[in-house]
């Protein structure tokens, strides 16, 4: 006779602990590194709470509650630093700022609550297919969080695997696919540990065979080499870079008498004295609109880079009251002349860069400058320089791999180097810096493109195409990071021009992952109907 499920008073604290462990796995608070094994352990704990025995699964409504507690703890302890931007820099009262973080975490956790409830409603009790369904439900929740209501996928479980064995999957299925595989493996481990899988070696072989067939189909259909190593006779040119980190205090950054003057003086001098082929200054390094700058300031920089063998990318707000404002990157080089290259940010930060409908009352209580930008398009042109195609992205835009992937629709014009310009100073000296670094590393793995990062306070770094940090500047210091970066994919006809992930995400976005998850759900519902018919 099956035993009753454990009480909620016992399950919910463990769900809370598992959620906290999931958050810590993304960037360990005492070192900043991702811990893939801790993420798997936290997922295994969640799976065990949902299926406490070989012949027992919790009721769907209890599963939803467990999943909601797990996800709320995970998300709130992942982006708790939003409190700093709202309270310290936005002057929002501390209780209201803390409540806002918790409400956001609980709202996003509702996707996981629904997914876990659906899993326990549909999953078979004795089959390894339950692991497949668990991975599919987890994938649906991650996709919903990353896509709906502008999307906020910060802290997705797959980022914990930037250094783990599952990192090899990034070039095929991206961070969401890695998270789904981790969920599948977590439930398989739980079932294997208690002998719930009567024929588990056969199931694992079937899963491995299906994965191999899928990869072979991708290689044949897309004409993409699945090997990461480039041909030995092919070597892309090296680009020397200088990445500027001004470390302008966030509470001074937009004050005319202090931070603004310091930023204009320091960045102006650094941009003029740099010697590298490419110089990058971070997001809003120049914290004034062009028409607010002292006469000749921007024109002087443009003339400097028009005369020498150098180029610069620098962050600056752009526009006017008539046309609207954008958070932009300006590109200066001998080729641009009087018409500099410009990239405008597409994925704006809710409440910080635009006001969502019905929330003006909330943003009115905060004192955040530059808070109402226009949104630009996806897939903007790259900045061509020194034989490279440089693709800027601003702030947390590198969180959305599907949007970066839009630039890979034509391999001949695909980026060879990603350039991230950020200002994480809004969130203080917190784990947000390390989390953002892991996000950039995952993008480098997915597209096999190096990522250079110029930030106000950190992490200013150079990441190679294998996701390894090769150079990094000390956080919260003022300085210049010098290094070399090797662009990738200059030859559009070589087998390693783009990864499988870049190929399919450029064409269909995240829809293939949505479709795979939906197919798994359809299979589970059909299997459930068949079981009920046999029972009748």
Curated annotation (Swiss-Prot):
GO molecular function, one term: N-acyltransferase activity
The UniProt record lists the keyword Metal-binding: no
Entries under PANTHER family matching the protein: APOLIPOPROTEIN N-ACYLTRANSFERASE
E.C. code: 2.3.1.269
TM stretches of this protein: 34-54, 64-84, 89-109, 129-149, 172-192, 199-219, 503-523
Protein role: Catalyzes the phospholipid dependent N-acylation of the N-terminal cysteine of apolipoprotein, the last step in lipoprotein maturation.
Active-site residues (renumbered): 283, 345, 395
Protein's cellular compartments: Cell inner membrane
Designated name of the protein: Apolipoprotein N-acyltransferase
GO BP terms: lipoprotein biosynthetic process
Every CN hydrolase domain range: 244-487
Cellular component terms per the entry's GO annotation: plasma membrane
Pathway: Protein modification; lipoprotein biosynthesis (N-acyl transfer)
Coiled-coil segments: none
Keywords: Acyltransferase, Cell inner membrane, Cell membrane, Membrane, Transferase, Transmembrane, Transmembrane helix
Membrane topology value: Multi-pass membrane protein
Disulfide bonds: none
Main location: membrane
Enzyme class: transferase
